[in-house]
Design a protein with these regions (language model features):
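Conserved ATP-driven motor cores of ASCE-family P-loop NTPases powering translocation/secretion/packaging/pilus
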Residues: 102-188
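General N-terminal targeting signals
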Residues: 51-53, 68, 132, 155-158, ...
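Active-site donor-binding loop signature of nucleotide-sugar glycosyltransferases
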Residues: 38, 144, 192
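Charge-patterned, long linear interaction tracts outside catalytic cores
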Residues: 185-203
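P-loop NTPase motor domains
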Residues: 1-113, 126, 167-184
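Alpha-helix capping and helix-coil boundary motifs
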Residues: 44, 160, 200-203
Length: 203
């Protein structure tokens, strides 16, 4: 489908507001937690991907206008976080190798913007000529039945990749392999939201 036909479909679906008095600036739109649910578009992947591309570009342009915050602390010295962008089922956009996604990954830290890409398989992070694994410093690998030692080695876990691959295949709910710049790789258990709410209710 040509871009114009996809845009025509989006107009027909009335995705965007016509009355400018009912719209808000993008930075105001992003105030707080914002979830863009694409399931309402049904099986129309072309329109979904076009909408994601539009949102990524607007997010990037907004990021460039963000005031750079000073570092926090001295030892360690950490970057202040302004916002996080989470893309679920990210393989649907990584395959298109959008230049704006690469820019967000490479430039985001400078502006205190983090990008979280969630996908079912590690092989999704190598798309065509773009290797999305390179700019990603932190990984949470949940149960992946067919994960290989080679895939984990590509994340910098070469020391015991074979053993870790076998453990990843058998992980339970909320368990994952955690890897970051200051962690060579360890297995941890996440804190489910329902447990957090239960703990708050008991206080």
């Amino acid at each position: 489908d040509s871009p114009m036909s996809i845009i025509g479909d989006m107009l027909d679906m009335e995705i965007f507001e016509e009355d400018q008095s009912k719209t808000v600036p993008f930075d105001a739109f992003l105030d707080g937690v914002v979830v863009i649910a694409l399931d309402a578009l049904g099986q129309d992947d072309h329109s979904k991907n076009m909408l994601v591309a539009v949102m990524l570009n607007m997010f990037y342009e907004n990021m460039l206008r963000t005031t750079k915050l000073p570092f926090l602390g001295q030892d360690p010295q950490l970057r202040a976080i302004d916002s996080y962008l989470l893309v679920d089922e990210a393989d649907n956009i990584m395959r298109y190798e959008f230049d704006v996604l690469r820019k967000l990954l490479l430039q985001g830290r400078e502006f205190g913007t983090g990008v979280i890409l969630a996908s079912q398989y590690l092989r999704h992070f190598k798309a065509g000529g773009t290797d999305y694994r390179e700019p990603l410093l932190t990984w949470f690998v949940h149960k992946v039945p067919n994960v290989t030692a080679t895939e984990l080695s590509a994340l910098g876990l070469s020391a015991s990749a074979s053993e870790m691959a076998e453990r990843v295949k058998a992980l339970g709910n909320h368990q994952c392999l955690y890897k970051s710049f200051d962690s060579p790789g360890e297995f941890i258990r996440g804190y489910p939201f329902y447990e957090l709410m239960r703990a708050r209710g008991e206080q």
